[in-house]
Amino acid sequence: MAHEGHSQHSGLVWALRPILAWIFLVACGWSHPLQTRSWGHPGLAAKVRTGQLQPAGHPQSSVLPSYPRIQVPGSQTPPVPVPCCTAEIDRPESLLESCGAPSPECEFFLGQLQGALRDRFHPQLFGARPVQPLCPELCQIWFTTCQADFICGPTWLQSSGERGCEPSCRTYGQTFANATDLCHSVLGHVLRVAAPGSSHCLNVSISSPGARRRPRAWISNVVGSGSGSGSGDSPEPMFGFQYVSLP
């Protein structure tokens, strides 16, 4: 039994690192170079903002009843296509060529998801907590938020064997059939997707604008990424992660 538990967590250590790198880089859809220091794995950014996991019933957390695209100020410009994958980047040590600038809301979501997964599963890598699945709502919001953003083909999701790139850039909507397909394809060999109404899963939540002024300013800094053109009076959605545990 102990050996089985050790093998499970060893497998999670091996699988989670490249998957988080893939999430944060949006495959070959990142718009600027990234540092490669975090966890000592190529592709993981050294300067990533920490996502928040909030306990169920948190007064500032509420699961979305529907799945709107997460909006961020200045997010009206669609991604601009540029040359996609080349043969030279079909190597783990190579930098990924841009597929076009990601939309601000998708870039923001992926940064938060990367931080939340890192914080949530770091203790689980050492066997301190059981591995919990993803809520289907998280998958749906992920898919809806990034549906129009460019991404490389599914071959980039392979954790072993030969990897290749599609000859042209594709969007999330063209690559994945739906939200469940997205989560299964990207994280399925590490995290399963919980059944609807599951009592234990990782979910997303959005609180009303202005309810949490300090986190709001923090999120503004993340989205602005040094642009210096913040609009402090503009309403902004609050995005966070929530660990759901229902009775």
UniProtKB/Swiss-Prot annotation:
MF terms in GO: riboflavin binding
Membrane among keywords: yes
First-listed, main subcellular location of the protein, grouped into a coarse class: secreted
Keywords: Cell membrane, Disulfide bond, Extracellular matrix, Membrane, Secreted, Signal
Disulfide bonds: C99-C169, C106-C146, C139-C183, C152-C165
Cellular component terms (Gene Ontology): external side of plasma membrane; extracellular region; interphotoreceptor matrix
Signal peptide residues on this chain, from the entry's feature table: 1-31
Compartmental location: Secreted, Extracellular space, Extracellular matrix, Interphotoreceptor matrix; Cell membrane
Membrane topology of this protein: Peripheral membrane protein
Pfam family, one: Folate_rec
PTM comment: Not N-glycosylated.
Family statement: Belongs to the folate receptor family.
Name the UniProt record assigns to this protein: Retbindin
Organism per entry: Mus musculus
